[in-house]
Amino acid sequence: MGKTGLRVYMVGGIQGMTYDECVKWRVNVGKVLEAYGIEALSPMRGKAYLQREVSIKDSYEQHKMSTKAAIFARDKWDCLRADFILCNLLKASSVSIGSMFELAWAQDHGKYIIVVMEDEGNPHIHGFVQESASLVVSSLDEAVRHLLVVANVYDENQVKALELPKLD
């Protein structure tokens, strides 16, 4: 756990994507959050064996960490033990069913949810997604800035001037 004791679970599409598409933004955002004492939880941790996959499937029964049951259980556990949910839906070409489950669990358990998606053309633009979110923004940069303020680890005026690396 980070110095603050706070955790963020990083929700976003996985199925049909490459390993790098799934991991890159989570690693980049995780580094920033951890620099401020916030633990970043990724559903891709411990899954380096998927690096060669061109299009990740919903499960891999031959890998204990990637069976349907294991994915469902760990992702739900991570979602419920997190204080915040950062849901990256940018550039989605189809609805992420797993992400929608995670948003529902988080909303039902009173988590602070930041959804990141385009203002137009995203298949997740729907009343349920928008109403389950505490905040909807259009960039990871904006999401991280808001998260740092809400987590009370950075002053609202200072966070505007904060230099962040490229996150997506």
Q: Where are the language model's segments positioned?
A:
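Conserved catalytic or regulatory cores that recognize and/or transform ribose-phosphate-containing ligands
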Residues: 1-168
